Curated annotation (Swiss-Prot):
This is Sulfur carrier protein FdhD. The gene is fdhD. One of its GO terms (biological process) is Mo-molybdopterin cofactor biosynthetic process. The active site is at C124 (cysteine persulfide intermediate). The keyword Cytoplasm applies. SUPFAM superfamilies: Cytidine deaminase-like.
Length: 273
């Protein structure tokens, strides 16, 4: 991924660089009213443009957009390998942010053939898929081994995760996705959308060539279909979440061979597949 370039138009110097902003509010406690400032998580339109063609507009927290683009491109099967990304350019405007991604011609031909237009909402799952059959036919199997002792590492990792969410700590409004190896959290990404946080994490793993067979994903969200799909797409063998799974997430985790653990709180967790 060394050939990638990034143009941020001073993103690192504006208010979006921290992922939240301060707003004036009126707080009511009983009959007492006071004007106070509160921190809220940033939600910003980010257009993903492949070879000059707009593919999706995602509502995301405008941080870590290069790894977000890499992760999204892989988990949505737009590319088969990170080498198919030639360049990433990030351009900020008053309307939002454009992420212009240059991909190999064979990947672009495939994208045009299977193109879908997404209105990327914070709970977006399979919006834009042309038919129900696509859910079945495009789901990849997981081939990396799952190690049972990883389950014993979940409680300690969850404690660590609670201490490594700076955006959520001040806003209470961000999801987090973490990579756990040998019981320790190696990296965490936060976003207003759980699927965006996961794409950022997975893009980071790919960009830095981190061995995805040696750890698992831990998330502060429910386990939904799109999280299982994205993990399976990148051959992740365990997904652990703090909240409940959906029925489709369980079904597809079983079908793909991905281990799914949810309700990961304190020393408890429930294994669903």
């Amino acid at each position: 991924m060394d050939s990638l370039t990034e143009t941020t138009n001073a993103l690192s110097n504006d208010t979006h660089a921290q992922g939240y902003q301060s707003v004036s509010t009126t707080r009511h406690v009983g009959h007492i009213r006071e004007v106070v400032y509160d921190c809220v998580v940033e939600e910003f339109p980010v257009a993903l443009i492949y070879n000059g063609i707009s593919h999706a507009v995602m509502m995301t927290t405008p941080l870590d957009l290069e790894v977000f683009a890499i992760g999204f491109s892989l988990t949505e099967a737009i590319i088969d390998h990170p080498r198919q990304i030639y360049d990433i350019e990030i351009i900020k405007s008053d309307l939002g942010i454009q992420v212009e991604i240059t991909i190999a011609s064979e990947a672009f031909i495939k994208l045009k053939t299977h193109r879908r237009t997404l209105a990327g909402q914070t709970g977006c799952g399979i919006c834009g898929i042309e038919s129900l059959q696509q859910i079945q036919h495009t789901f990849p199997p997981v081939t990396h081994d799952f190690f049972v002792h990883w389950l014993d590492q979940i409680p300690d990792a969850m404690v660590q995760l609670q201490q490594q969410q700076p955006i959520s700590a001040v806003t209470g409004g961000a999801h987090a996705a973490a990579w756990v190896v040998n019981g320790n959290i190696l990296t965490v990404f936060e976003d207003v959308g759980r699927h965006n946080a996961l794409d950022k994490l997975l893009g980071h793993l790919v960009k830095h060539d981190i061995d995805r067979s040696q750890g698992f994903v831990l998330m502060t969200s429910r386990a939904s279909y799109e999280l299982v799909k994205k993990c399976a797409q990148l051959n992740i063998s365990l997904l652990a979440t703090i909240s409940a799974p959906t029925s489709l997430a369980i079904e597809l985790a079983k079908r793909s061979g991905l281990k799914l653990a949810s309700f990961c709180r304190q020393s408890r967790y429930v294994v669903y597949s």
